[in-house]
């Protein structure tokens, strides 16, 4: 067994109980395909190294144990099953193919085996393959929207950076346009306009996509708002889920139809499609009022005040992404951290059943989407007018 610590896998000992012969056979069938390209984790004793067959770290297990040894290995570990994730949304029979076989044939990356975020992390090719596999689901949510990119050209976290403007060698269907930001400054921005450009971005070390809440063709008429639930110190994942469900119910009372996605971290993004009748200033004022109203419905749970000291044991409702030029992680975007979790759209029923959002990642998500479909496929059909509330800000 091994666990991630500081971005690297570290050896945590062996587990020899908790499974019978049938379970062992099932595990072998799951593990055997993962042997190719595997490397040993840090801290493996020499005598163990000689007898082990290593696999790539793509499966998570539930292990019960008594305590840990001085070198942090698990003592008396018992296997309690794999921590699989599943999504229940049925496949849409009308799934639109946006990435053709010819587009897939154009994928090309240099240094395909370069690992990101540590010796046992995913490769540059893994990222290219992920975005190719989820493209039919992701592209409807990003095409034509202003986009910022997070690039990690060396694979080291310290070298990752935001790319908001044009860059050398940019794919043809990633276009630039000029617009004013929230400070009134004219800047050039990016927009992905086709599948080939989207797929080609993997060559440039693109790991994350962040989008505006509007389309390039109607910049001054935002068509969605995002409320980012950011948990403070001492808040567990289950509490964030319960808080999100509370907000869903409150937004429903305001006549809105909210959608949920994991942030790719410890939070949840609640996205609400709107009719685009308001400009950015009025939209930001409206979302400020909505966030303030939501916080008053459960003041011991929520805060709208920025700063870590204000969110201890509480959840910060970040509505500031709803200003001109501000972005949030796009649906199905990977996040540049260990094991590449994805910001994953989920149905509300699925959200309540998820125990470990980080398991929705570059490895697991393509297969889940192939069987479950996109729960946000019809999000635009639920656009509503924003209610008028009085903001205290």
Descriptions of predicted regions:
Residues 10, 35-36, 46-129, 139, ...:
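C-terminal accessory nucleic-acid interaction domains of nucleic acid-metabolism proteins
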